[in-house]
Amino acid sequence: MLLNGAKILVNCLEEQGVRNIFGYPGASILSVYDALAKSSIRHVLTAHEQGACFAAEGYARRSGKAGVVLATSGPGATNLVTGLADAYMDSVPLVAITGNVPLAQLGHDSFQEVDIFDVSMPVTKYGIIVKSASEMAPAIRRAFALAESGRKGPVLVDVPSDIFDCSAEYEPAVPEHTL
């Protein structure tokens, strides 16, 4: 089925069993908030992105599942760094999803552009930049697999804002069966 990147993201979060997501809205992620409003996922609004990251970390510690935090571009994304570092040091599974400037503006010092991929590299297990809506589902599934396997820890998924509005074919994940 043909869906926009934001809806693909939210569907993948539901596939992973995500029931709560922590965050603070911003312009680059408004499409995600529109998709979340039509989903089964509960958004927990915090007063600051750092608080959202620590709340997601606390959720992960308590539930044993990866916590999920959502932040906008620029200072919204950089506000996650302390929480990501804490999750990294304590091996807490976390998936941090950040919006960024539109793809064509990356690398041009655009308003609120921060290279959060490189900034977060020392304090994450892995980072992914989603460059097309068709990459969204594989990126989210990989982020959860990496966050929750081996030495657990935070994984960053950075998404240029226009990718949330681009469409791509989405196929739900096939559940794995165990005997």
Regions found by a protein language model. Name each.
Residues 1-179:
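N-terminal alpha/beta PP-like core and its mobile active-site loop of ThDP/TPP-dependent enzymes
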